[in-house]
Design a protein with these regions (language model features):
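Accessory N-terminal region flanking or inserted into the helicase ATPase core
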Residues: 1-25, 29-30, 50, 122-206
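A sequence-level detector of short, solvent-exposed, charge-rich linear segments
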Residues: 38, 83, 99-103, 107, ...
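P-loop NTPase Walker
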Residues: 1-96
Length: 206
């Protein structure tokens, strides 16, 4: 059952909780107050341990930093991507990189930049059966831009939210798989790949 609390009501710091509220309801304010409460009352932090405050956007990081000006040395505020990269990918990725033929010597983390030049699309199309029927290269590019890692019930798949077509024919999964293989062989790790490889590392090395 849900418990309704006022934003200035301290919670037990060893108890899990979830906040559900609409825009402008004071979620960030409540979170800041809770962080301060943990800093003031925790018996486990000591002098060297820090609180990890993980958000999904850089704007969230900046907002929280701005509201905790005196706690920078005790609170690590970062996005989920930077947290996973610094604490999982950077120190441990080399354990699984060979499985994916990832060119670690060229590794570059990028956001939404995709390898979709004419040459890249040509190479990717060679992984599709009956390649000659997929003539609309722009549709293939759009399919890649629409794709994300999603859990299909057994594993993660890189694919669009719904089947997409090129020249009236549904683009097969092999095309999306080929893109990831192509990007990794060129040392490109997209933001979503940070989540993907972190998941793979935690599953293989729990």
């Amino acid at each position: 059952s849900a418990t309704v609390s006022e934003s200035n009501t301290p919670r037990k710091i060893e108890q899990h909780f979830k906040i559900k509220a609409g825009p402008g309801a004071g979620k960030t304010y409540w979170l800041i107050q809770h962080i301060k409460h943990v800093l003031n009352t925790s018996v486990r932090l000591g002098k060297i341990k820090r609180i990890a405050c993980i958000t999904y956007t850089n704007i969230g990081v900046e907002t929280i930093h701005g509201r905790l000006p005196d706690c920078a040395d005790r609170v690590e505020v970062c996005t989920i991507h930077s947290f996973l990269y610094d604490n999982i990918i950077k120190p441990y990725f080399h354990y699984i990189a060979p499985e994916y033929n990832f060119a670690t010597d060229k590794m570059k983390v990028v956001d939404d930049t995709l390898l979709t030049s004419n040459g890249a699309i040509y190479q990717l199309k060679n992984n599709i059966r009956k390649v000659q029927i997929y003539k609309d290269d722009d549709a293939l590019r759009q399919a890649l831009f629409s794709s994300r890692w999603v859990f299909d019930g057994t594993d993660l798949k890189f694919k669009p939210p719904y089947p997409m077509k090129s020249s009236r024919y549904t683009i097969p999964q092999s095309f999306y798989d080929a893109y990831k293989k192509y990007a990794w062989e060129h040392g490109i790790m997209h933001y979503d790949d940070v989540l993907y490889f972190s998941y793979k590392l935690m599953v293989k090395y729990p």
